[in-house]
Amino acid sequence: MSGRSVRAETRSRAKDDIKKVMAAIEKVRKWEKKWVTVGDTSLRIFKWVPVTDSKEKEKSKSNSSAAREPNGFPSDASANSSLLLEFQDENSNQSSVSDVYQLKVDSSTNSSPSPQQSESLSPAHTSDFRTDDSQPPTLGQEILEEPSLPASEVADEPPTLTKEEPVPLETQIAEEEEDSSAPPLKRFCMDQPAVPQTASES
C-alpha cells in the first residue's frame, strides 16, 4: 500500500509543478521588441520585453524609477529572471536589427506607445531605411553596412565555385604535361615498380 501513496504523492507534486510552469508561461507568453533604457544612463537598447497590461505598466512606471535592475526590467520581474536571462542571451546579438528600426520605432513610440504599433513593424520596412540616405547614418548603422558587403560576396562564391568545376580538355592536357615535368620524387615514385623488376631480372 505504500507504493500507491508514493505514486499519488508524486502525481500531486507533478500537477503542482505543471501548474507553476503554466503560470510562468502565461506570464511571459507575449513578447514585444521595445526600446529599453539601461539603468540610470541614457543608453537605450532595442530588445524583446514581455508585454505588460496597462495596469501593470502604470505600476511598473511608478516603481521603475525607484527600483530598476541592471538588465532593464522592473524588480517585480525577478521571479522569471532565469527565463529572461536565457532569452536575452539568445537574442543579445540582435543589435543590428535595432539600428535599422531605430528611426521608425522612435517616431511610433513618441506618438503612442501601444504594443500593436511596435508589433506592426515588418522586415519590409528595412529596405526603406537602407535605401534612404537623406539622413546621416548612426554609428551602429555604419557597422551594420560593413559586414553586409562581405556576406553578399560570400553568398556569391558558391555559384562561382560550381561553375569553375568542369575543366576543359585543353587544361587537362596541360596538367598532364606538367605532371611529366614533376619533381624527382614524383618521378621516382612513378618509376618505382619498374626498379624491382630490373633488380629481379639480374
Swiss-Prot record:
GO terms for cellular component: SWI/SNF complex. Residues 53-202 are annotated as: Disordered. InterPro entries: BCL7. The keyword Chloroplast does not apply. Disulfide bonds: none annotated. It comes from the Eukaryota. The modification Phosphoserine is found at S114, S118, S120, S122, S127, S148, S152. GO terms for biological process: apoptotic process; cell differentiation; Wnt signaling pathway. It holds the Pfam family BCL_N. Positive regulator of apoptosis. Plays a role in the Wnt signaling pathway, negatively regulating the expression of Wnt signaling components CTNNB1 and HMGA1. Involved in cell cycle progression, maintenance of the nuclear structure and stem cell differentiation. May play a role in lung tumor development or progression. This is B-cell CLL/lymphoma 7 protein family member B. It comes from Bos taurus.
